[in-house]
Amino acid sequence: MNTLEKWYSVIKSNDLNDLEDLLADDVVFYSPVVYTPQKGKEITKVYLIAAKKVFGEIKTRDIKSVNKNEGPTFRYIKEIVNGNSALLEFETEVDGIYINGVDLISWDERGKITEFKVIVRPLQAVTALHRIMQAVL
């Protein structure tokens, strides 16, 4: 199983304890609502678990489904892979606010995620995420 398949498996399973094996010890996480990069496996897990709580459970059979009539609203709608990095575009809705964003993920030769960057639009989405993530963290 490659790194992206493992990532999809982790978020589908709703068991984020599997993040331990997927993240490099020195992974760097870039949040759309925090100015400084968050360095290290433990803090990255904290942010990813909080994001999972905010976005809700993923219950669809195909996480890349774009059928808006199925399951929860979070879904990846585009995947671009180049070597050891990927751009995963997603859309979701939180508190009635449409969120469009990308996860930029890079990994090393062992398949461990070394960088995870989240970019979100529009401004209302960033503002809402900031408020909600503060409450969760």
Question: Which role fits each region the language model picked out?
Answer:
Residues M1-L137:
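C-terminal and inter-domain tail/linker signature
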